[in-house]
Amino acid sequence: MSRKLITINQVKDYVGQEVTIGAWVANKSGKGKLAFLQLRDGTAFFQAVAFKPNFIEKFGEEAGTEKFDVAKRLSQETSVYVTGIVKEDERSKFGYELDVTDLEVIGESQDYPITPKEHGTDFLMDNRHLWLRSRKQVAIQQIRNAIIYATYEFFEKNGFIKFDSPILSGNAAEDSTELFETDYFGQLAYLSQSGQLYLEAGAMALGRVFDFGPVFRAEKSKTRRHLTEFWMMDAEYSFLSHEESLDLQEAYVKALIQGVIDRAPQALETLERDVDALKRYIAEPFKRVAYDDAITLLQEHEADKDTDYEHIEHGDDFGSPHETWISNYFGVPTFVVNYPASFKAFYMKPVPGNPERVLCADLLAPEGYGEIIGGSMREDNYDALVAKMDELGMDKSEYEFYLDLRKYGSVPHGGFGIGIERMVTFVAGTKHIREAIPFPTFVAPLASVIQSSIFPFITSTYEETPFPFSQVQIFSSLLDLVWPSLITVGTSWPITKIKRKNCKIIFP
């Protein structure tokens, strides 16, 4: 068989030529002398057509019939080398198809669990490693890739240097109650919830820096917008004002959206995303509204028949329904600026002349997607930062390096962070954040954690001593024994289902 191996997204350059594609059979149909193969290879999906007379003409009656029968018997997710002539096809969304001239099976696939019918979410998450192969899941990961690519491209063009912060940390960047703790050779350490504090040191050395990597939040939020492990881009910069920071954030988000439109148009089409809406978000300026003005606006409209948020007072933090209403009211991504200091991080710089408010901003995405960026100017005055830490009862010895940044040539500086999964969810137009990351880790009900995570762990650990109990009986017993510090974090991938905290199961 010919081995001019190309990928599906390259076929447009080989019209009229014979090529070979390594792919998986996503679906198959046909009858009689025709077999229609839906192929995928990670770059795209498209159709290959096998016609029996063509096989007989090339290989003879017996061998050609055998080849065609192989094509007709192909099962879902069988891997193949398919050789054929590339042809344009205006009827196809992809625009091309392959007239098959030869076919070779690489790896067979029998009884593939995710058939082309509807499946429940729990089933799909239990089979996440296979669900990733489906057309929509491939499209979401292609959009994720385009966003990551555009991130590096944007910061390179804007003079930022990639600066890697540690994942294990001895201090908290934000709320210490949202940290995963771990033992570090007898010392208490945390899984990073943000690289920001270290990035500030980088900004004092390099001017403009950004980081991109996994972060962890021990939030027990069971919403479509929360994960306990996700990927975050943090940026930090010296000598920029608050308004300049907002300009940079707006340009960044628009660059991400444009990057997806340019690099993954087929993915957007697969997901039936409203591309005109995305283009409008690029073309129109983002709205900027002060926190207090947003509260007043919410109060004025809370009696409207189309609102579904609870009453909110000045000084309260927004809930998801408030954020949704605000962004939908303006119809474009909206910065809410100058929140109360009472529920924001200790390092945020107060608004000049108004110490009750801080120079910060959350960017709220329209269409109900809520906050996608959080940023602020950092307190650059040593005495003011120490006073704030004392007010909050913080142990300054844990932040000596951070305070040093204010002692040796401090400058105005700020930064922002964006959870990549929230951005992917927004741009892709999907309903739940768990689809925006290959293997999501999120809070799950205790029952599902015990049954889907702990039971396989028990049976694999104690396989030489089989338990004469059902899963339900084991689950019932463990309810009385489960450790107090258990953080019930569920995940779709069995290997990572053992939790982040040290824990023990004690058997009576």
From Swiss-Prot:
InterPro entries: Aa-tRNA-synt_II (IPR004364), aa-tRNA-synth_II (IPR006195), aa-tRNA-synth_II/BPL/LPL (IPR045864), Asn-tRNA-ligase (IPR004522), Asp/Asn-tRNA-synth_IIb (IPR002312), NA-bd_OB-fold (IPR012340), NA-bd_OB_tRNA (IPR004365). Belongs to the class-II aminoacyl-tRNA synthetase family. It holds the Pfam family tRNA_anti-codon. Homodimer. Its EC number is 6.1.1.22. This is Asparagine--tRNA ligase. It catalyses: tRNA(Asn) + L-asparagine + ATP = L-asparaginyl-tRNA(Asn) + AMP + diphosphate + H(+). It is found in: Cytoplasm. One of its GO terms (biological process) is asparaginyl-tRNA aminoacylation. The keyword Phosphoprotein does not apply. The lineage of its organism: Bacteria, Bacillati, Bacillota, Bacilli, Lactobacillales. It is an enzyme of class 6 (ligase). It comes from the Bacteria. Keywords: Aminoacyl-tRNA synthetase, ATP-binding, Cytoplasm, Ligase, Nucleotide-binding, Protein biosynthesis. One of its GO terms (molecular function) is nucleic acid binding. One of its GO terms (cellular component) is cytoplasm. SUPFAM superfamilies: Class II aaRS and biotin synthetases, Nucleic acid-binding proteins.
